């Protein structure tokens, strides 16, 4: 989805991702780029491999509360750490960048054009996509996603 936003000119991959909880003046997390989130080298603290994101998945928390409050542990771009939070934050930033059409964006710009009509990405109770998991799809839609990936997004 971020790749589609790049193609549409909505996102520059090397620019900071607009995560709403990082808006305080001087917050060093505000310099974390889209690229660092997508490569899982944001430098944000996690509490273990993959980190625990159950609060957003089943605990009633929001993406912003679960992922947006993690402090920096390393300099961004220096350490890879598999992190669901980084993907959740990229999705949150994308929603903020897209604005009012954020809930329709995955369907209009990726899923339906690829023929993935039986895919459902879940949101938290505020309507922010989770996307680190909680995406339900048929095997055929998964195959369509694989073909899209194999063909360089075309």
What does each model-found stretch correspond to?
Residues 5, 41, 93-97, 149-152:
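Generic structural signal for hydrophobic core residues of well-folded globular domains
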Residues 56:
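Conserved catalytic core of nucleotide-sugar-dependent glycosyltransferases
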Residues 76-81, 91-97:
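Short beta-strand->loop
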Residues 86-93, 133-154:
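Active-site-proximal alpha-helical segments within enzyme catalytic domains
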Residues 1-13, 37, 90-94, 142-145:
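Active-site SXXK
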Residues 7-44, 69, 98-133, 137:
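Active-site helix/loop module of the DD-peptidase/beta-lactamase fold
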Residues 24-52, 60-78, 85-88, 137-140:
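Conserved catalytic neighborhood of penicillin-recognizing serine enzymes
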Residues 3, 64, 108:
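Short glycine-/small-residue-rich flexible loop motifs, especially phosphate/cofactor-binding loops
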